[in-house]
UniProtKB/Swiss-Prot annotation:
It catalyses: a purine D-ribonucleoside + phosphate = a purine nucleobase + alpha-D-ribose 1-phosphate; a purine 2'-deoxy-D-ribonucleoside + phosphate = a purine nucleobase + 2-deoxy-alpha-D-ribose 1-phosphate. Its EC number is 2.4.2.1. Phosphate binds at G20, R24, R43, R87, V88, G89, T90. This is Purine nucleoside phosphorylase DeoD-type.
Amino acid sequence: MSIHISAKKGDIADKILLPGDPLRAKFIAENFLEDAVCFNEVRNMFGYTGTYKGHRVSVMGTGMGMPSISIYARELIVDYGVKTLIRVGTAGAIDPEVHVRELVLAQAAATNSNIIRNDFPEFDFPQIADFGLLDKAYHIAREMGVTTHVGNVLSSDVFYTNMPERNMALGKLGVKAIEMEAAALYYLATQHHVKALGIMTISDNLNDPTEDTTAEERQTTFTDMMKIGLETLIAND
């Protein structure tokens, strides 16, 4: 057991999907995994291990924001030996070419958080995805016919901003979307020499507020992202 995860050694696979929403983790386990067993209910942050196409995989919620994912991802890596972590979550589009229900593969993640500057206050340490995972996910998405964008995202500490014009300026520089976790996950992966990738479904278009999705859709209908994440996890087995 770790401080925040009640699983025993061996309960968690060495490859895992990480949705922010624990109910999305439950949905993935119930709809995609065979023989899924719940390994964690602490703080209702549900985690499950089962098989997908004969391969042992896990899925666990991480909550919202970089402090939360940092807790769970670190414990998964350090205490349970997880080697491959794929975030499957939502993001808000800021690139005018990116639209609701399309996918973004986060090649790199800029951040306005101090979570990394606590270690490197003198400069901005770049947070990048594992290229092998990125490449596999991109080709799997293309084979599935899913509209997918590859590029930088902004991992933000702020959901409701008072300065939206700053976000829009980033969109003009080619930043695809804003989300709240990838930079912290990538930093932990770099620290511990494991693999990580962020796959995001666009749930909101910050350039066009008429493009949006419901809370229920965010929880249960972004199945392309879930399938691509699972297929990417098992691609090396």
